[in-house]
Amino acid sequence: MLDSKLLRTQLQDVADRLASRGFTLDVARIESLEAQRKVVQTRTEQLQAERNARSKSIGQAKQRGEDIAPLMADVERMGNELSEGKVELDGIQAELDALVLSIPNLPHESVPVGADEEGNVEVRRWGTPTAFDFEVKDHVALGEKFGWLDFETAAKLSGARFALLRGPIARLHRALAQFMINLHINEHGYEETYTPYLVQAPALQGTGQLPKFEEDLFKITREGEADLYLIPTAEVSLTNIVSGEILDAKQLPLKFVAHTPCFRSEAGASGRDTRGMIRQHQFDKVEMVQIVAPEDSMAALESLTGNAERVLQLLELPYRTLALCTGDMGFSAVKTYDLEVWIPSQDKYREISSCSNCGDFQARRMQARWRNPETGKPELVHTLNGSGLAVGRTLVAVLENYQQADGSIRVPEVLKPYMGGLEVIG
């Protein structure tokens, strides 16, 4: 969340910057609540001081042999008024807190200004899409030909937007995840992490999914215990490792990577990508998270994005890198790069990774800090996250880009060790 001091001292400037994201900040409501808070707080503090003075005078009156009943009545009345004032103050603060939690992050000055995805800026391209000399098939046709990609059975088990993978395609899916994890551990310096797939609400609030995006989550309600949510991304569990912690400067940067299933209701995706594996309720992803000192976060974003790009390069999949504009960035990000991989059957690039610097936005929500050796004081860390990569979409890209005229699939060179040396499937 944003710094409350910034909202008090530079509210209009914050509103102007948020407008570039298409977000309208309710300045009047915040100003009104802040004014109410100040009035009630001042009144409460004055009442507390007066009550303390009256309480002290009771002892003095007692020593003089005076009737203390009126003073006792005053103290009791003031105590009741203080209790009422606290309830009122808590109510105002709760509304302010809810408003602040609904405000997205401020975009970095280097982010291109735009209203939607049309305003995104292509930064670079890598690779050249293959010019096939036959009619390309999509991944659904390729997978169903041999019975290795089974949406009908998945629908029988779980409904729409699920997939059942079998045989060589299931093995290829596993190979991709193992290859990605090994690359990030061995070449990029990440620590492999196994995390819970179910988290409590504070973890999701810490990374920004709650309270604003609850409809996108799968929730498990338990009688007598805290509700649990299936993770929409390992970003939630990985980033929250440092929730409530004060890290030593020597611990930074922290670099975590995890391969997990992800669960999303896709509440806003009705009618989009209904065929195949592009948009699923359950999908696997290899997620990278970095926890860094504030001055290092922009350089870390470039490095993290490069880590994700390296996966695509080694798989020899054509892709492009986009700098997202202000109107297309995620809620918690100050700056985001999207990687889009070439999908031959659609004749276009599709998102396969999103890499974001969240600045101190998530850290403030989580109270994740480090001790600055120059000041000796705890300060907020900066957090970054990125897909390295979405495994299902990478599988789609491999199936389509490595297809042959007879419907068989060549195995990418870097995956052959994970596939027992298999050269072709199908």
Swiss-Prot record:
Q: Which GO terms describe its cellular component?
A: cytoplasm
Alphabetically sorted, this entry's keywords are: Aminoacyl-tRNA synthetase, ATP-binding, Cytoplasm, Ligase, Nucleotide-binding, Protein biosynthesis
Q: What is its EC number?
A: 6.1.1.11
The record lists the catalysed reaction(s) as: tRNA(Ser) + L-serine + ATP = L-seryl-tRNA(Ser) + AMP + diphosphate + H(+); tRNA(Sec) + L-serine + ATP = L-seryl-tRNA(Sec) + AMP + diphosphate + H(+)
Where is this protein found? Cytoplasm
- Is the keyword Transport in the record? no
* One term of GO molecular function: serine-tRNA ligase activity
Its BP terms in the Gene Ontology are:
selenocysteine biosynthetic process; seryl-tRNA aminoacylation
Keyword S-adenosyl-L-methionine assigned to the entry: answer is no
- Pathway(s) this gene product operates in, as recorded in its UniProt entry: Aminoacyl-tRNA biosynthesis; selenocysteinyl-tRNA(Sec) biosynthesis; L-seryl-tRNA(Sec) from L-serine and tRNA(Sec): step 1/1
Positions of L-serine binding = T233, A234, E235, E287, S387
Enzyme class comes to ligase
- Cite the binding residues for ATP: R264, S265, E266, E351, I352, S353, S354
Q: Which domain of life is it from?
A: Bacteria
The record describes the protein's role as:
Catalyzes the attachment of serine to tRNA(Ser). Is also able to aminoacylate tRNA(Sec) with serine, to form the misacylated tRNA L-seryl-tRNA(Sec), which will be further converted into selenocysteinyl-tRNA(Sec).
Free-text comment about domains? Consists of two distinct domains, a catalytic core and a N-terminal extension that is involved in tRNA binding.
**What binding partners and quaternary form does the record give?**
Homodimer. The tRNA molecule binds across the dimer.
The record, for NCBIfam families, names: serS
Please name the PANTHER family in this protein's record: SERINE--TRNA LIGASE (PTHR43697:SF1), SERYL-TRNA SYNTHETASE (PTHR43697)
Family to which the UniProt record says this protein belongs: Belongs to the class-II aminoacyl-tRNA synthetase family. Type-1 seryl-tRNA synthetase subfamily.
Instruction: Quote the protein name from its UniProt record.
Output: Serine--tRNA ligase
